[in-house]
Design a protein with these regions (language model features):
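Active-site-proximal beta-strand/loop segments in catalytic clefts of secreted hydrolases
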Residues: 137-140, 163-167, 190-191, 232-236, ...
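N-terminal Sec-pathway targeting helices
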Residues: 1-12
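Short glycine- and acidic-rich boundary segments immediately preceding or forming the N-terminal edge
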Residues: 62-63, 69, 74-111
Length: 357
């Protein structure tokens, strides 16, 4: 018995020594190191390749989500939607709503070269499946309305994309931060919602670029961290000469599949009816609404309930890479003297309150 034990111990020792030699050889192998450098170089080359993307390249499903609400500790799928150098969205708190709409899946958008989405204007990338909906909101953040929209989304354990006006974001940075903290995707919608297809912007591309870039910078600064290279033109007016510019900036352009025209509606029930009627006809779609509109904020709980009842599933769009702002336009935003440089922006109720009435 002792002989067997001694032999076994000797064999184990020899095995460990052999394993150590193999590891040491690999660690010192210059061929392996060179292969690693080559791999990194190829990756950088791929990033710089601005050739048009195929659907599978521009849009990629992240680790699939179930249609049930996302729990607090379910961070694997959320983190997989971003590369290591981009921040993963904050997951929801544990969902206590058994009837919540939840998320079906998360879609990663590779914005290299400025791909365009939304079949109302662009037909190349139609990535949604039947009964899938991507919720998008324009013109915020706005007090009262944006918090109503956010609460409804959180109550239903789901997410959306917000295209914010830069000037609005500088007025209410705390609202932009709340959206980001809740894991919403935040893109931009110009600095002051100017129609870039009209003069003076139609005649002066530099003014148009400034309107776009100041919006990008302002939203980024209001959030206080990375935002998405997602952009939507005001009034869905997309001047052709600006499309290549956004391509050089690797900013994706979003039109819509379904415009609810909620800005023309004053009753929440009409907003719900518009969205559901058009979805029933289209079967799926990127849904355009406005968190600037009070009726839309009021409509959200019922709209999300009807989406769940109708068998629709929510898809959340996230970027592969975060936006990069340009210093020139960062300074322009700061020069407006409207931007709060505080990292701890306080809510209005904490600054001003009625003590006698």
């Amino acid at each position: 018995m002792r002989i067997v034990v001694v032999v076994f111990a000797a064999l184990m020792t020899l095995g460990l020594v052999a394993f150590g030699l193999v590891v040491a050889q690999k660690a010192s192998d210059p061929t392996a190191a060179a292969a690693g450098v080559s791999s990194l170089q190829n990756t950088e080359s791929a990033k710089n390749d601005k050739a048009p993307l195929h659907l599978g390249e521009a849009v990629k499903a992240a680790a699939p989500f179930t249609s049930t609400p996302v729990a607090q500790n379910d961070t694997t799928a959320v983190a997989a939607a971003f590369p290591a150098h981009a921040p993963a969205p904050t997951p929801f708190a544990a969902c206590n709503n058994p009837d919540a709409l939840g998320l079906s899946r998360v879609i990663e958008i590779d914005t290299a070269g400025g791909p365009a989405f939304g079949t109302e204007h662009f037909k190349q990338y139609d990535f949604l499946r039947d009964k899938e909906v991507a919720l998008t909101f324009d013109d915020g953040p706005w007090p009262g309305n944006t918090p109503m929209v956010l609460k409804a989304l959180q109550d239903n354990c789901t997410k959306a994309t917000f295209f914010e006006i830069g000037e609005h974001a500088t007025w209410r940075p705390e609202l932009a931060k709340q959206l980001a903290a809740a894991g919403m995707t935040i893109g931009s919608h110009t600095w002051s919602h100017k129609d870039l297809a009209k003069n003076p912007y139609a005649k002066d591309i530099e003014q148009a670029k400034q309107e776009i870039e100041m919006g990008v910078s302002a939203v980024y600064m209001a959030v206080g961290g990375p935002t998405a290279p997602f952009f939507r033109f005001p009034d869905l007016q997309q001047p052709r000469d600006l499309m290549p510019y956004l391509g050089t900036r690797n900013i994706a352009i979003f039109s819509t599949d379904i415009d609810t025209f909620d800005f023309k509606l004053r009753r929440p029930e009409d907003v719900v009816k518009s969205a559901m009627t058009k979805l029933a006809k289209n079967g799926k779609g990127i849904l355009l609404m406005h968190d600037f509109q009070h009726a839309t904020g009021e409509a959200m709980p019922e709209l999300l309930r009807q989406l769940k009842a109708g068998g629709y599933k929510i898809v959340h769009m996230v970027p592969k890479e975060p936006i990069t702002t340009l210093a020139k336009y960062d300074e322009m935003v700061r020069a407006r003297d409207k931007y709060s440089t505080s990292n701890n922006a306080r809510s209005e109720s904490s600054v001003v309150k009625t003590i006698s009435e």
